[in-house]
C-alpha cells in the first residue's frame, strides 16, 4: 500500500518539499507520495485529526502552524519542546510525535562546509526570532560553547539566551555592537528576513572586517546571494545560503519517516534547478 506523506501550511503552493521528497521516493524505489495540503489556521485541529485518521505516515509543518500544531500532537520531542515549535510529525504506533528538524538541519548544513568541528567555534547569530531560536538551541545541543545573539531589540536576544538550559557562554548584542565586533567571530549566521526578495538591498549587518576563514551563512535562499553574503564573499569569507538548511532539514525528516537516508546532493541540485539556479 502506498505510504502518504505531506506538508501543511498556508500559503502552500510555493512549497518545494513535494518535488524534493517525491523525487527521493522515486530514486529509492519507494511506494510513497508526498502532497502539499493547504490548511487554514481555524481548521488546524480538524486537519490534523483527518490526517491521522487517513493513516498518514508523517508530515511537515510550515507557516503559520509550527507553534499551534503542538496542541494537537500526542508527544513532542524534548528539543522541539525547548525550541517551542514543530516542523516534522511522525505517525508511529498510533501516535503523532512532533520534532523540529530546522535547527538540526541547519547544524548539519553548517558542518558540511566547515573543515573543523563546530564545538570550538565562536558564533554570532543575527536575529532572535523563531529560526534563530531553533538554530541556537540546536547548536547548543551539538556542543557549541560560545554563541552570541545580536538583535535590533536587545531584550529579545536576552530572552532567547535566558531560555537555554545548556552550558553556553552567550552575550546579547545590539546590531551596532555586533558590526564593530564582527572580526572576532568564526561563524556569522543571518536568521532574519532582512535581505529577502524584494528588499534585496537591505542587510542587518554591514560586513567590513572579517577574519580569515570566517563562515557567513544566511538562511534566505531568495535571492541566492543576499547583500550580506555578497559583502562577505568580497571579504574572502566562506558563504552559504539557505538552500543547504532547507535540504538538510527535509532530508532529516525523510530519514525519520522512512529509515532511509536520501541523496543530499541530488536533493540540493533539484531544489536549485526549481529555483531557477
UniProtKB/Swiss-Prot annotation:
List, alphabetically, the InterPro entries matched: Aminoacid_DH-like_N_sf, NAD(P)-bd_dom_sf, SDH_C, Shikimate_DH, Shikimate_DH-bd_N, Shikimate_DH_fam, Shikm_DH/Glu-tRNA_Rdtase
Q: Where does shikimate bind?
A: 15-17, 62, 87, 102, 221
Annotated NADP(+) binding sites: 127-131, 151-156, 219, 242
CDD domains, alphabetically? NAD_bind_Shikimate_DH
State if Amino-acid biosynthesis is listed as a keyword. Answer: yes
User: What SUPFAM superfamilies does its record include?
Assistant: Aminoacid dehydrogenase-like, N-terminal domain, NAD(P)-binding Rossmann-fold domains
Enzyme Commission number, as recorded: 1.1.1.25
Spell out the Gene3D superfamilies in the cross-references.
Leucine Dehydrogenase, chain A, domain 1, NAD(P)-binding Rossmann-like Domain
BP-aspect Gene Ontology terms: amino acid biosynthetic process; aromatic amino acid family biosynthetic process; chorismate biosynthetic process; shikimate metabolic process
Which pathway is this protein assigned to? Metabolic intermediate biosynthesis; chorismate biosynthesis; chorismate from D-erythrose 4-phosphate and phosphoenolpyruvate: step 4/7
HAMAP family cross-referenced by the UniProt entry: Shikimate_DH_AroE
Purpose: Involved in the biosynthesis of the chorismate, which leads to the biosynthesis of aromatic amino acids. Catalyzes the reversible NADPH linked reduction of 3-dehydroshikimate (DHSA) to yield shikimate (SA).
Q: What is this protein called?
A: Shikimate dehydrogenase (NADP(+))
**Species per Swiss-Prot/TrEMBL record:** Bacillus thuringiensis (strain Al Hakam)
Amino acid at each position: 500500500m502506498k505510504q502518504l506523506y505531506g506538508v501543511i501550511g498556508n500559503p502552500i503552493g510555493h512549497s518545494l518539499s513535494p518535488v524534493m521528497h517525491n523525487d527521493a521516493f522515486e530514486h529509492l524505489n519507494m511506494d510513497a507520495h508526498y502532497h502539499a495540503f493547504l490548511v487554514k489556521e481555524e481548521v488546524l485541529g480538524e486537519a490534523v485529526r483527518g490526517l491521522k485518521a487517513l493513516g498518514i505516515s508523517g508530515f511537515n509543518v510550515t507557516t503559520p502552524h509550527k507553534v499551534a500544531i503542538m496542541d494537537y500532537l500526542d508527544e513532542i520531542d524534548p528539543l522541539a519542546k525547548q525550541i517551542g515549535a514543530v516542523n516534522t510529525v511522525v505517525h508511529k504506533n498510533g501516535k503523532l510525535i512532533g520534532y523540529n528538524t530546522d535547527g538540526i538541519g541547519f547544524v548539519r548544513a553548517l558542518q558540511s562546509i566547515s573543515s573543523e568541528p563546530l564545538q570550538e567555534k565562536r558564533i554570532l547569530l543575527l536575529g532572535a526570532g523563531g529560526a534563530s531560536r531553533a538554530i541556537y538551541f540546536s547548536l547548543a545541543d551539538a556542543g557549541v560553547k560560545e554563541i552570541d545573539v545580536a538583535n535590533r531589540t536587545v531584550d529579545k536576544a536576552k530572552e532567547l539566551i535566558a531560555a537555554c538550559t545548556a552550558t553556553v557562554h552567550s552575550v546579547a548584542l545590539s546590531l551596532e555592537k555586533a558590526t564593530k565586533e564582527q572580526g572576532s567571530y568564526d561563524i556569522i549566521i543571518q536568521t532574519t528576513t532582512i535581505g529577502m526578495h524584494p528588499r534585496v538591498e537591505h542587510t542587518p549587518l554591514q560586513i567590513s572586517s572579517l577574519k580569515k576563514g570566517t563562515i557567513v551563512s544566511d538562511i534566505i535562499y531568495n535571492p541566492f546571494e543576499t547583500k550580506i553574503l555578497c559583502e562577505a564573499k568580497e571579504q574572502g569569507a566562506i558563504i552559504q545560503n539557505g538552500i543547504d538548511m532547507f535540504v538538510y532539514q527535509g532530508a532529516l525528516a525523510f530519514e525519520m519517516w522512512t529509515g532511509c537516508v536520501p541523496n543530499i546532493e541530488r536533493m540540493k541540485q533539484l531544489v536549485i534547478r526549481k529555483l531557477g539556479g
